[in-house]
């Protein structure tokens, strides 16, 4: 399996679990890599750190929900782990 395929598996996991707590160790396990190597490879391929990428994806989801929902801002923010 190529390195980008390992990272792609973890990206899929991130997308499916954005409203949950996501641990870097779990992502590394999904990608079949050590945590250290996973973080280095992720940053090299995605051009962002793992946690920065997750935060930006969550912000994008919050923005989309704010535009398409009548839910309160606080409820949407809490749904995606912002406090």
Placement of each model-derived feature along the sequence:
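Terminal helix-turn-helix DNA-binding modules in bacterial transcription factors
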Residues: 4, 8-25, 44-80
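Short, basic/aromatic recognition patches that contact phosphate-bearing ligands
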Residues: 30
């Amino acid at each position: 399996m190529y390195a980008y395929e390992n990272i792609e598996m973890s990206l899929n996991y991130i997308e499916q679990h954005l409203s949950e707590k996501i641990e870097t160790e779990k992502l590394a396990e999904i990608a079949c890599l050590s945590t250290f190597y996973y973080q280095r490879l992720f940053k090299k391929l995605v051009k962002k750190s793992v946690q920065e990428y997750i935060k930006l994806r969550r912000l994008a989801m919050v923005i989309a929900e704010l535009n398409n929902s009548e839910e309160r801002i606080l409820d949407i923010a809490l749904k995606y782990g912002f406090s």
